[in-house]
């Protein structure tokens, strides 16, 4: 059989409408008859990125005040009983603590990225603290 040369033909417009399979048609008609609608889900990572942007913009404290205050009092009990704290002292401790933790997590994230990972692990925190000189 001899080969024939194919010539280009002009398109007649858009795609022809395709017939739906029976399963697709059944699926589309189900929610209309009172089926339960699934809640909307974002793709993995979308919400995380949104939260990152939100918390980078904000300046408010992220740890709740009363649980942090209880923790401070519990730790202080080991050193001296019946210590009293000014509210400004607890606020200063909380501000310093959150600032330290945010910086540590930034360094931890850099350690994870350096290891070609996107998930932080305890070994990343240990490496970040060791590089900082906080722990040998």
Swiss-Prot record:
The modification Phosphoserine is found at residues 11, 29. InterPro entries: Histone-fold, Histone_H2A/H2B/H3, Histone_H3/CENP-A. Expressed in bicellular pollen, root tips, shoot apices, young leaves and ovules. Keywords: Acetylation, Chromosome, DNA-binding, Methylation, Nucleosome core, Nucleus, Phosphoprotein. Coiled coil: none annotated. The modification N6-methylated lysine is found at residues 5, 10, 19, 24, 28, 37. GO terms for cellular component: nucleolus; nucleosome. It comes from the Eukaryota. GO terms for molecular function: DNA binding; protein heterodimerization activity; structural constituent of chromatin. Acetylation is generally linked to gene activation. Can be acetylated to form H3K9ac, H3K14ac, H3K18ac and H3K23ac. H3K9ac could compete with H3K9me and prevent gene silencing. H3K9ac is restricted to euchromatin. The modification Phosphothreonine is found at residue 12. Signal peptide: none annotated. Residues 1-43 are annotated as: Disordered. The modification N6-acetyllysine is found at residues 10, 15, 19, 24. It is found in: Nucleus, Nucleolus; Chromosome. The nucleosome is a histone octamer containing two molecules each of H2A, H2B, H3 and H4 assembled in one H3-H4 heterotetramer and two H2A-H2B heterodimers. The octamer wraps approximately 147 bp of DNA. Belongs to the histone H3 family. Core component of nucleosome. Nucleosomes wrap and compact DNA into chromatin, limiting DNA accessibility to the cellular machineries which require DNA as a template. Histones thereby play a central role in transcription regulation, DNA repair, DNA replication and chromosomal stability. DNA accessibility is regulated via a complex set of post-translational modifications of histones, also called histone code, and nucleosome remodeling. This is Histone H3.2. It comes from Lilium longiflorum. The gene is YAH3.
